[in-house]
Amino acid sequence: MFKLGKSVDIKCDREELFRFHLNTNNITVISPPFPVVSDIKMSSNPLAKGSTVDLTVSFILFKMKWFLEVSEVLENSLVRDTQLRGPFKYWVHDHIFEEIPGGTRMTDEVRFIPPFGILGLLALP
């Protein structure tokens, strides 16, 4: 299993940033530019524990459906999404919100097993 993480300090109230992440209208704002995410369907707005997210992920040569579930929500602290079906053998993504002087530290942590066995390792950053 692999783990990637990245933190960013944002001059914003922790509760406000947490609510921003749960608002489904903001998914395109918080998604990276690659891979391209489209055909997004979410079961609720705002997201809550048990909400589902269905989307299409476009890589250079192919598209793939990805089904996620919001598996845990800790008020103003954590949003966890877990892959139900998609490109990875295993995928758990945590958005962690921590109050710091002057704002909020948001940390993204992803634990995953790449697809395609050893060939999947070629796709790692």
Where does each model-flagged region fall?
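Short beta-strand micro-motifs in enzyme catalytic cores
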Residues: 2, 51-53, 104
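Short, surface-exposed coil-to-beta transition loops
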Residues: 3-5, 63-67, 89-93
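Beta-strand/loop substructures that line and gate deep hydrophobic ligand-binding cavities in soluble
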Residues: 82-125
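A short, structured loop/turn motif at beta-sheet edges
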Residues: 14, 46-47, 71-78, 96-105
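Hydrophobic pocket/interface hotspot
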Residues: 17-21, 27, 53-55, 70, ...
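Hydrophobic ligand-binding cavity/cleft-lining segments
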Residues: 1-48
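Glycine-rich portal/gate segments that line the openings of hydrophobic small-molecule binding cavities
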Residues: 38-85
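Beta-strand elements of well-folded, non-transmembrane domains
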Residues: 10-12, 57-61, 72, 87, ...
